[in-house]
UniProtKB/Swiss-Prot annotation:
A motif (PDZ-binding) lies at residues 422-425. The chain crosses the membrane at residues 92-116, 169-190. Pancreatic beta cells and brain. Its main location: membrane. A motif (Selectivity filter) lies at residues 154-159. It catalyses: K(+)(in) = K(+)(out). This is G protein-activated inward rectifier potassium channel 2. GO terms for cellular component: axon; cell surface; dendrite; monoatomic ion channel complex; neuronal cell body membrane; parallel fiber to Purkinje cell synapse; plasma membrane; postsynapse. Residues 392-425 are annotated as: Disordered. Associates with KCNJ3/GIRK1 or KCNJ5/GRIK4 to form a G-protein-activated heteromultimer pore-forming unit. The resulting inward current is much larger. Interacts (via PDZ-binding motif) with SNX27 (via PDZ domain); the interaction is required for recycling to the plasma membrane when endocytosed and prevent degradation in lysosomes. SUPFAM superfamilies: E set domains, Voltage-gated potassium channels. Residues 117-140, 160-168 are extracellular. GO terms for molecular function: G-protein activated inward rectifier potassium channel activity; G-protein alpha-subunit binding; inward rectifier potassium channel activity; potassium channel activity; voltage-gated monoatomic ion channel activity involved in regulation of presynaptic membrane potential. The gene is Kcnj6.
């Protein structure tokens, strides 16, 4: 009985909601460790480690935004931009509206043609050869509906023909012809834009499954890989990245999805890509980087998401195309590097996309970039890149002194030689 109460109380603690669950508290709360039997009795759906809970994505791997708009009261705004609304609809609804619009217009004008014939009395003089109807051979609603289709689609079979003794029919013919042209232009244009949308072009723009953090040119860098599967290239391709992470301001305001720019070469022009073969996009982790204070041990505890956006123009159509993807904490590998995919063959370069997502482990410090910089400045970490750079700087200074004062250097060498001779004597 005591064990059951203990299990129930621990379950309530783990399932309890907290208003400040997204705000990091400076006070560490240590939960008592349960006996093994009590831990086994806990429900399996309860996680004992909150750091291992799944992070909710803001942008999915396929590029679709995981956001649903609710309680939208001003729905009339969608009707003010009816063309964009129709283009954004799914194909099944778009085709249904396409068929319904034409069917309704045919039925509407067919009903009007039948009413004109009925009011004029054409239905009562069908077999009277001396009677001049509004539309010849129109003897019911079905024939009026067929005449409406022939008029709007300009088929013109010639069996049903409007006569010159019916001015209201002539006016209706003009109205239906004009409205039919407008409907054709609107619906065909909508279908054309729907078909020519560059969304499917983004399907052949691929991103690596994981992002990696490793050393590159003596600096800690965050890297991911992008590629284009088509032979027709993306013109004016550019890449940018955003960090999505919760934030609490100094005034106490909580921002659940704060967006921070990640520099992937904006100031140097490296963000503009010539995407003929797969490229590795690199972000240098420096003082301006949001990853400046994140180490290997701290990375799994962070709840963050990196959204990458690749934009460019489709070479065939000239329309702007955008591809998106994202990386959560579990998809960022510390101490790994991408496997090369480009090889030189006989007269051409070959890309092996089987190795596009592959990574291999490499030697990488587990400290954060800030800690590495502090240790390098205090000369407590014998980093090869810092030592070599200091030696190079010392050699350059000596070379500059020799070029500026060659006479002083000659006198200095002469004095040294005289001192050596005196010491020998």
């Amino acid at each position: 009985m005591t064990m059951a109460k203990l299990t129930e109380s621990m379950t309530n603690v783990l399932e309890g909601d907290s208003m400040d669950q997204d705000v990091e508290s400076p006070v560490a709360i240590h939960q008592p460790k349960l006996p093994k039997q009590a831990r086994d009795d806990l429900p399996r759906h309860i996680s004992r480690d909150r750091t291992k809970r799944k992070i909710q994505r803001y942008v999915r791997k396929d590029g679709k935004c995981n956001v649903h708009h609710g309680n939208v009261r001003e729905t009339y705004r969608y009707l003010t931009d009816i063309f964009t609304t129709l283009v954004d609809l799914k194909w099944r609804f778009n085709l249904l509206i396409f068929v319904m619009v034409y069917t309704v217009t045919w039925l509407f004008f067919g009903m009007i043609w039948w009413l004109i014939a009925y009011i004029r009395g054409d239905m009562d003089h069908i077999e009277d050869p001396s009677w001049t109807p509004c539309v010849t051979n129109l003897n019911g609603f079905v024939s009026a509906f067929l005449f409406s289709i022939e008029t709007e689609t300009t088929i013109g079979y010639g069996y049903r023909v409007i006569t010159d003794k019916c001015p209201e029919g002539i006016i209706l013919l003009l109205i239906q012809s004009v409205l039919g042209s407008i409907v054709n232009a609107f619906m065909v244009g909508c279908m054309f834009v729907k078909i020519s949308q560059p969304k499917k072009r983004a399907e052949t723009l691929v991103f690596s499954t994981h992002a990696v953090i490793s050393m590159r040119d003596g600096k800690l860098c965050l890297m991911f890989r992008v590629g284009d599967l088509r032979n027709s290239h993306i013109v004016e391709a550019s890449i940018r990245a955003k960090l999505i992470k919760s934030k609490q301001t100094s005034e106490g305001e909580f921002i659940p999805l704060n967006q921070t720019d990640i520099n992937v070469g904006y100031y140097t022009g490296d963000d503009r890509l010539f995407l003929v073969s797969p490229l590795i996009i690199s972000h240098e982790i420096n003082q301006q980087s949001p990853f400046w204070e994140i180490s290997k041990a701290q990375l799994p505890k962070e709840e963050l998401e990196i959204v990458v956006i690749l934009e460019g123009m489709v070479e065939a159509t000239g329309m702007t195309c955008q591809a998106r993807s994202s990386y959560v904490t579990s998809e960022i590998l510390w101490g790994y590097r991408f496997t090369p995919v480009l090889t030189l063959e006989d007269g051409f370069y070959e890309v092996d996309y089987n190795s596009f997502h592959e990574t291999h482990e490499t030697s990488t410090p587990s400290l954060s970039a800030k800690e590495l910089a502090e240790l390098a400045n205090r000369a407590e970490l014998p980093l090869s890149w810092s030592v070599s750079s200091k030696l190079n700087q010392h050699a350059e200074l000596e070379t500059e002194e020799e070029e500026k004062n060659p006479e002083e250097l000659t006198e200095r060498n002469g004095d040294v030689a005289n001192l050596e001779n005196e010491s020998k004597v």
